[in-house]
């Protein structure tokens, strides 16, 4: 009898953990227009000027835990936005596009966040570009060529089309399957671990959601 109740409890706990449910309008919302042309499973919009975006990368390390707890092969497409249409943000957007094309994201992401928000060593477009060149060991000629290339322009054009289509109005914004946006601010931040676990649970729930 004792063994029966232990088995029942294990089954019950297993059933509970695999059937977590979240509420539309609370933990997540539908995007304004659903993307229909086979969007990546996860799209993240961020800004190097956004303190909360910095927290997601540095403090919570969300992408690391997505790959660790969901799948190491899960594709995450990341875009740096220019919501203010300012020249400095435009250059940040371009630098990020170059980084993605050249697979240099990990070399520049945290250092540029820190240079802008923590150390305040990146305050102008020239020292932004110089910092990027130092971090990536790229020369200025190559950077100018790549940053003005068709590939980079196409990357930014596609990004801005998505932003307009879904009516992006804030960062950070995590879009799941081109249908849902996570409401980050509703997730309680009692502890780093609590926030990470809840965030990952919501992503997993939306990735598995049928409709």
UniProtKB/Swiss-Prot annotation:
Under Gene3D superfamilies, the record lists: Glutaredoxin
Domain of life from the UniProt record: Bacteria
Matching InterPro entries, A to Z? DsbA/DsbL, Thiol_disulfide_DsbA, Thioredoxin-like_sf
The name on file for this protein is Thiol:disulfide interchange protein DsbA
Name the family: Belongs to the thioredoxin family. DsbA subfamily.
Alphabetical keyword list: Disulfide bond, Redox-active center, Signal
Q: Does the keyword ATP-binding apply?
A: no
Q: SUPFAM superfamilies, from UniProt?
A: Thioredoxin-like
Q: Which residues form the signal peptide?
A: 1-19
Biological role stated in the UniProt entry:
Involved in disulfide-bond formation. Acts by transferring its disulfide bond to other proteins.
- Intrachain S-S bonds: 50-53
């Amino acid at each position: 009898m004792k063994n029966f109740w232990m088995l029942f409890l294990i089954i019950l706990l297993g059933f509970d953990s695999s059937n977590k449910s979240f509420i539309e309008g609370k933990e997540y919302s539908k995007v304004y227009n659903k993307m229909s042309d086979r969007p990546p499973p996860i799209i993240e919009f961020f800004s190097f000027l956004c303190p909360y975006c910095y927290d997601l990368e540095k403090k919570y390390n969300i992408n690391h835990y997505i790959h660790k707890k969901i799948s190491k092969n899960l594709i995450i497409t990341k875009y740096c936005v220019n919501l203010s249409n300012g020249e400095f943000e435009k250059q940040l957007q371009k630098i990020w596009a170059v980084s993605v094309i050249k697979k240099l994201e990990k070399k520049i992401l945290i250092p540029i966040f820190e240079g802008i928000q923590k150390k305040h060593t990146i305050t102008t477009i020239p020292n932004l570009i110089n910092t990027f060149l130092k971090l990536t060991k790229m020369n200025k000629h190559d950077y100018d060529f790549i940053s003005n290339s068709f590939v980079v322009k196409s990357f930014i054009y596609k990004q801005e089309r998505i932003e307009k289509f879904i009516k992006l109005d804030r960062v950070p914004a995590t879009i799941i399957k081109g249908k849902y946006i996570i409401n980050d601010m509703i997730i309680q931040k009692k502890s780093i671990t609590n926030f990470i676990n809840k965030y990952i649970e919501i992503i997993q729930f939306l990735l598995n959601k049928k409709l």
